Amino acid sequence: MALQLLIGNKNYSSWSMRPWVLMKQLGLPFEEHKLRFDFAPDSPFRRAVAAVSPAGCVPVLVDTADGFAVWDSLAIVEALHERFPAAGVWPSDPQARARARSIVCEIHAGFGALRSHCPMNIEAQLPEVGARVFAEQAEVRLNLQRIEAAWADALRSSGGPYLFGAFSAADAFFAPVCMRVLTYALPVSDTSRRYIDHVKRTPAVAAWITDALAEADFIVEDEPHRQQR
């Protein structure tokens, strides 16, 4: 079984980060195929992604043995759980697993205000933007409040250090949120801060951050708050 994961720029692509971090941290075998974001109609990025995914978005997981592709980060996670049932993609306890899926679906489908006003940008340091957004955007405050409540509930039930004890898809899905809190210096509780620090030190997350900082790329479409690096 030879799996290839197509991803976008590590500095910006929060959806790519999720399955990559999960697979790397759990030791699942895969080959990374990184494509530089370029959203022009006939760009190499669009052509390469369209060749394997009708959705035209990253991430995409391809089984190179037969070319079968799975797209969308949550669909990829479920495919990995089926392929590697003992790897720990989801918590082993049925109730914990159901709760993990519930909060992952929340982040997958919701929190649009946080995503829109504070897009992932690992390399940037934007505390002034974060302070302004937090003060002016009530929906961002509500998004962050709900995220912190979900974290606190999971950590209280599991005892930590990850949301459900051991690292799982839930932590992989919230890793980009942790990056946003750090980039924009968003105010969070001490419990959330400890969790964010632990996620940041997770080997797979640390490796992703290192790669993101090394990209030295500037994608205008992903930079609503800066004119240059």
Description of each model-found segment:
Residues 1-134:
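GST-like domain detector, emphasizing the conserved glutathione-binding G-site
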Residues 5-7, 33, 165, 182-183, ...:
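Short, contiguous strand/loop micro-motifs
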Residues 36-38, 195, 213:
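Conserved beta-strand edge residues that scaffold enzyme active sites
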Residues 81, 177-178, 209:
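Active-site-flanking alpha-helical
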Residues 87-92, 115-117, 159-164, 206-211:
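Short, hydrophobic secondary-structure boundary micro-motifs
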Residues 107, 111-201:
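GST-like fold's C-terminal all-alpha helical module
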Residues 212-229:
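Acidic/histidine-enriched, glycine/proline-rich intrinsically disordered or flexible terminal extensions
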